[in-house]
Amino acid sequence: MTIAIGRAPAERGWFDILDDWLKRDRFVFVGWSGILLFPCAYLALGGWLTGTTFVTSWYTHGLASSYLEGCNFLTVAVSTPANSMGHSLLLLWGPEAQGDFTRWCQLGGLWTFIALHGAFGLIGFMLRQFEIARLVGVRPYNAIAFSAPIAVFVSVFLIYPLGQSSWFFAPSFGVAAIFRFLLFFQGFHNWTLNPFHMMGVAGVLGGALLCAIHGATVENTLFQDGEGASTFRAFNPTQAEETYSMVTANRFWSQIFGIAFSNKRWLHFFMLFVPVTGLWMSAIGVVGLALNLRSYDFISQEIRAAEDPEFETFYTKNLLLNEGIRAWMAPQDQPHENFVFPEEVLPRGNAL
């Protein structure tokens, strides 16, 4: 006679059932992060496609911005709300639109809709990488790396306009609209001379350089056990085993630079560190611009240029260009302010 002693299995609740369904092995993994990711990504992308196809920016910027009005892929945009809307969330049922969808689109409600759903969609994608990394049993460095573009998006599209007078000063969602925003950043903030922008450029271009060098080096050092192997004959794209030589790569770069990465972990961490840190730094810089913190100011050069008509530097030239951008862009970009600049206040070069 056998007596089995044990606990009765606990009754499965709705959480366990939902957890099983969300984590089921399927073609497109859903997961708990998918509850945030998929609806937000769908609504953000759908809102952008709807706005660029049908919705005008006439009421907010005095511009045509949709395919329906004759724009193309590079010139369509979902524009920011009017300056008079301040930092209102512009909810469809809010006091501005009062449930009128057409009025909501005219006021720029699609922009806040896309910006907020886009931000949460990106966060959901990062959480998806965390979740799958945990289930697969790998480290979460992909998710950590993806925090960099999220930081840039949030700082540029949300934090910067929150530091200014309204959502109006954020970028509109479109290619040409982003270019206009870059000119705005340069003219009003001298962004290219900001050290955080410099670190961002160094990170992005440095990351691209590292990727090119790394890919080329791996291709250069492919090998195959056996005789007569060359780089192009040695490798089968479907083979399982690793077939490149870290030792050979180390020897090559040691001869080129006199220094080389000694192991793969440090090499790949550096490739992660450079672009991610650059993007984080640029995001910090944009937060500074939201607070209207200034870039480098070389006052001594400005004073000397003002006193001496023959003294000019690239720095003082750029300041004149920035003044020109402001003088042109403020009346064009903010027609509601009714700016009028007399001839005598417009920028001139020292030689004039």
Swiss-Prot record:
Side Cytoplasmic, residues: 1-31, 132-140, 218-265
Compartments (UniProt record): Cellular thylakoid membrane
EC number of the protein: 1.10.3.9
Chemical reaction(s) catalysed: 2 a plastoquinone + 4 hnu + 2 H2O = 2 a plastoquinol + O2
Binding site for Fe cation: H214, H268
Binding site for pheophytin a: Q129, N142
Bilayer-spanning residue ranges: 32-53, 109-131, 141-160, 194-217, 266-288
Residues annotated for chlorophyll a ChlzD2 binding in this entry: H117
Record-linked InterPro entries: D1/D2, Photo_II_D1/D2_sf, Photo_RC_L/M, Photo_RC_L/M_CS, PSII_PsbD/D2
Binding site for chlorophyll a PD2: H197
Cofactor descriptive note: The D1/D2 heterodimer binds P680, chlorophylls that are the primary electron donor of PSII, and subsequent electron acceptors. It shares a non-heme iron and each subunit binds pheophytin, quinone, additional chlorophylls, carotenoids and lipids. There is also a Cl(-1) ion associated with D1 and D2, which is required for oxygen evolution. PSII binds additional chlorophylls, carotenoids and specific lipids.
Cited SUPFAM superfamilies: Bacterial photosystem II reaction centre, L and M subunits
Gene3D superfamilies attached to this UniProt entry: Photosystem II protein D1-like
Membrane disposition: Multi-pass membrane protein
CDD domains in the cross-refs: Photosystem-II_D2 (cd09288)
Any one of the GO CC terms: photosystem II
Residues that bind a plastoquinone: H214, F261
Functional description taken from the UniProt entry: Photosystem II (PSII) is a light-driven water:plastoquinone oxidoreductase that uses light energy to abstract electrons from H(2)O, generating O(2) and a proton gradient subsequently used for ATP formation. It consists of a core antenna complex that captures photons, and an electron transfer chain that converts photonic excitation into a charge separation. The D1/D2 (PsbA/PsbD) reaction center heterodimer binds P680, the primary electron donor of PSII as well as several subsequent electron acceptors. D2 is needed for assembly of a stable PSII complex.
Family to which this protein belongs: Belongs to the reaction center PufL/M/PsbA/D family.
Protein name: Photosystem II D2 protein
Species this chain originates from: Thermosynechococcus vestitus (strain NIES-2133 / IAM M-273 / BP-1)
Taxonomic lineage: Bacteria, Bacillati, Cyanobacteriota, Cyanophyceae, Acaryochloridales
